[in-house]
């Protein structure tokens, strides 16, 4: 078992705790970091190769339907020797990956660990009610790229962390509605200093800078050398059957000779075939 983490992921791990929101952009590795947190909480050790967990809790991952159906989380689970398939799961605990639409199915689960991916617990609908019931009886963390646009978006997470008894308690302490509006519209928030402190207690931001690695490969190909030389010598455009009038037109004809040669297309197809073979091999290994 090899579990490797980047520095920004290890830094986030040091700040994470039950009930936190792990905030990071696309490509920051939120999923890997969340599973590493679970691994550590269940007795694992990132500094000791092959260090097993000790009687890990059942883990439930609530994510988008797309991520569930494309098995993205299955790939993330593999380095931790976890799988939704019982015969592939080293620890034999229950591993469930499901979508937010089915959150209510798990509202009676207790003494387990939940990862809520792509946070959807805003407002006060069915998802939020199920989330609050789950949060009372289980360990949990949230993953999000955009944790909240307004203070009201944080109400469910604040309640789940025990900062407020319920939505009414939050509103009584912090919300002033616009009395001129025909529908409930927030005019302003009170005591925002406390709200900022509470948000900072649960928000773990991943300081991540994406670095693109360029890969260059030189592939020698042939071209029609006699035609290239004829154009150079005679200054004649063979495609339009007329004299070449300018230096830029001469360069364009040279490029056309080189770029339109069949050998270039063959080379591109060969590169694509090799890349596809490597991709299929990687997918096959992931399925084993």
Please place each PLM-identified region on the residue numbering:
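Conserved pre-motif I regulatory segment
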Residues: 1-20
């Amino acid at each position: 078992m090899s579990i490797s983490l980047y520095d920004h992921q290890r830094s986030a791990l040091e700040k994470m705790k039950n009930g936190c929101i792990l905030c990071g952009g696309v490509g920051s590795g939120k999923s890997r970091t969340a599973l590493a947190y679970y691994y550590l909480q269940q007795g694992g050790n990132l500094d000791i190769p092959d260090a097993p967990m000790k009687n890990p809790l059942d883990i439930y991952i609530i994510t988008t339907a797309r991520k569930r159906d494309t098995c993205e989380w299955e790939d993330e689970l593999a380095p931790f020797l976890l799988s939704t398939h019982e015969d592939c799961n080293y620890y034999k605990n229950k591993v469930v990956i499901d979508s937010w639409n089915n959150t209510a199915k798990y509202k009676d689960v207790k003494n387990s660990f939940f990862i809520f991916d792509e946070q959807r617990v805003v407002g006060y609908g069915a998802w939020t009610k199920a989330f609050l019931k789950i949060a009372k009886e289980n360990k949990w963390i949230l993953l999000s790229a955009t944790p909240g646009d307004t203070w009201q978006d944080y109400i469910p997470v604040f309640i789940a962390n025990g900062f407020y008894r319920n939505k009414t308690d939050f509103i009584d302490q912090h919300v002033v509605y616009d009395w001129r509006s025909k529908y409930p519209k927030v005019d302003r928030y009170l005591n925002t200093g406390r709200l900022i402190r509470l948000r900072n207690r649960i928000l773990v931001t991943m300081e991540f800078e994406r670095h693109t690695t360029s890969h260059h490969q030189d592939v020698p190909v042939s071209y029609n050398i006699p035609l290239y030389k004829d154009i150079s010598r005679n200054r004649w455009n063979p495609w339009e059957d007329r004299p070449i009038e300018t230096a830029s037109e001469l360069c364009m004809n040279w490029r056309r000779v080189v770029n339109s040669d069949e050998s270039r297309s063959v080379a591109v197809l060969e590169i694509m075939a090799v890349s596809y073979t490597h991709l299929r091999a990687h997918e096959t290994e992931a399925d084993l």
